Amino acid sequence: VVLGYYPEYWVLNSNLALQPAANIVGFAQRYPQSAMAEKLAADYIEEKVKMADFASAQPVLAYVSNADRAESCAMAQVRAKSGDPLVFAEYKDVWLTTNSQPESCTGLGRMMLSSPLMTEQDKQQRLWAQLRAGQSGQAIATAQTIGMNLSLAQLNSIQADPLNYLWSAPKASAADQAYLIYAIGRLADSDLNTALASVKRAAEGTPESVQKALY
């Protein structure tokens, strides 16, 4: 059996994105629990997600049990598109991470951002994480989904001299508080001790959730 499936595997794999789902499912059913069937199914899902053909990927999900990070995010996109309401809660780490991650996970994050299932508080947490990490472009996009307009020019000017900004930073509005979090993050990048010394003053008079984000 082992050698028997290689020729069939290569034929399917050579133009994987063009295969109907039934071909992949058929292979997986003929060679259950085999590494090649698992790989073929996982690769197929990733290819279909890249093409935004979520419907074709859907029947193949059941045949992947040991997905890596990129495959797992691709599968999550398919589940989300089919209306699975639990998927986003399972992938909160993708939502909040600021580390580089596979394209399928970045895509899942974008999908979450436009989903009505993510609350304003969820989006605020993502925004603050991106601000702390200095991801200004992504932070601006996240902020827009909660009706907050952050200025790239302002973020750049804070980045150039965060300590100077913190001395007289306004704190009244949600956007002010976002700039504050960004400024503390940039100061911590360059001078952690000064940032630690400045954070108490920066946090004074802000809501408790903002204070937590600052610290």
Predicted region positions:
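Alpha-helical solenoid repeat scaffolds
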Residues: 1-215
